[in-house]
């Protein structure tokens, strides 16, 4: 297996893009240029999105789409769109993933399963098809969403963990510990957009619980982020937090 495939395996979201292409590769056969270019552009796009760098993320997603489009394979194009959806879920920007939906008819079963998981609606038959790091979370969500916290906390890689936290929250696991985990995971990576979204939701949860001091502490962190925001990061985070504002009260 090539070093590119190893890198993708560490990145539970990005790994889906080239799984079929690289699954049968040998050390003597390098991955095709389009695959490597799509992988690197997708990773840069995901990072830029999480950081709130709007123009950069848009440019890099366009690059990734163009590289995959050169193959004429709509199933691979669907995977790229799911990667973008995963970054949105990690940042609490929830929609129906229209880019993926436009290609859903050609998506493989694993992609359909992942799309449902990102919406917080996994099915029992989906679990085995998901990225390995996400399977325990999906299994927990099938039982009681509140039990997913431990499974999310067991994920040690930042982006897969944040994606799992977003999926769990979307499924109804709006626990204070989950909100804190999401905020601190994003904070440790400097992902401004995601940090702001999770902190906004955390502040609202403290407000609803009557925890005035904790709410004020979170808002001081938000104030710092807003003062230093650039490239639209502040407004992006505010929008993301607003899109799930009612979840904290569930």
Summary of predicted features, one role per range:
Residues 30, 37, 56, 77, ...:
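Residues that mark the junctions of alpha-helical repeat units in TPR/alpha-solenoid scaffolds
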Residues 19-44:
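Bacterial Sec signal peptide processing site at the extreme N-terminus
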Residues 44-45, 84, 163-166, 182, ...:
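Structural register within alpha-helical repeat arrays
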